[in-house]
Amino acid sequence: MNLNSPAVSMLGGDTPAHGGPNSVLGGQGPSSILTGHGPNSVMGPNSILGPGSVLNPQSIQPMQSQQMHSLQGSSMQMHSHLANSNLNLNINPASVGPDRNPGSVMHHNLDINPPSVAYQNLTVPMTPLAYSVYDRDALTHQAPASNIAATMVPATPASQLDIPMPALQNIVSTVNLGVQLDLKKIALHARNAEYNPKRFAAVIMRIREPRTTALIFSSGKMVCTGAKSEEASRLAARKYARIVQKLGFQAKFTEFMVQNMVGSCDVRFPIQLEGLCITHSQFSTYEPELFPGLIYRMVKPRVVLLIFVSGKVVITGAKTKRDIDEAFGQIYPILKGFKK
């Protein structure tokens, strides 16, 4: 190819080096891309800067700095300043350029349809913009009011939550009926009563509610066992006294007294009984050949504890429920020190 020929010049102009109808830099040839009216021109009337182009000079309107407000729920606002901006980014697909060419999407008339962005304050009433996770700490998110009251959790120390509470298993109480009794007559006429003087010198009587057992002696003394609370033991003793009254005896209900309370608890961990017996030898007795549990005699309160390797603890000898709770509260930290 002869590059000096005017017909094949690629750099524009009429000289052998810069001219010709096929110039890409000058003239009005079909291959010109910088000037002229060629179909490939980037600056001509049919170029990307032409009247029907996207970047029409008339579609670029100067605009002062405005604030964009985007509603995020009821409490979130996003402020964005378009400082020193020369583009009005109100994009409406239905708008046209100044020459009514449908190719322009930026129009200086800013025709506003209901779904489009508002012109003055650029408020978007349709879908709120999603905010970043980094903005959540700086935003105060206000949830709608709820009819459900907030649950208040008391600040209870963890040490109190870990300590189990002992439960009453048996209460032994005594009553004086104040009259001599014929035990044979009681055994013959009363229900659920048995009397065998060769084995035991008392009538054994049982009732179902409260589920208890009474030992009635000829002297008028009575022992009530099996109740789970002091109130239940008192109620059962009164029922036994009423049964004796219905058999013709002038029985009274006097001198009611709780003699023994038995409670039990599970600490839920195995215990080293040998180490406990050696460390607390002054209060402990442990003979695994005779009894599998360690016998711990506490001085104050004056109770006896039976401690087993499985973690079960039986407290007996107490007069009140408070004594049982106090004794277990003292022994529990000691048992944790000998946890296997």
From Swiss-Prot:
A GO term, aspect molecular function: RNA polymerase III general transcription initiation factor activity
GO biological process, one term: positive regulation of DNA-templated transcription
Broad class of the protein's primary localization: nucleus
Compartments it resides in: Nucleus
Bias (Polar residues): 69-78
Keywords: DNA-binding, Nucleus, Repeat, Transcription
Pfam families, alphabetized: TBP (PF00352)
CDD domains recorded: TBP_eukaryotes
Superkingdom assignment: Eukaryota
Any one GO CC term of the record: nucleus
Region feature Disordered, mapped onto this chain: 1-78
Keyword DNA damage attributed: no
Low complexity biased stretches: 57-68
Sequence repeat coordinates: 168-244, 258-335
Record-stated family: Belongs to the TBP family.
Protein's job: The TFIID basal transcription factor complex plays a major role in the initiation of RNA polymerase II (Pol II)-dependent transcription. TFIID recognizes and binds promoters via its subunit tbp-1, a TATA-box-binding protein, and promotes assembly of the pre-initiation complex (PIC). The TFIID complex consists of tbp-1 and TBP-associated factors (TAFs). General transcription factor that functions at the core of the TFIID complex.
HAMAP family from the UniProt entry: TATA_bind_prot_arch (MF_00408)
Protein name according to UniProt: TATA-box-binding protein
Source species of the chain: Caenorhabditis elegans
Gene designation per UniProt: tbp-1
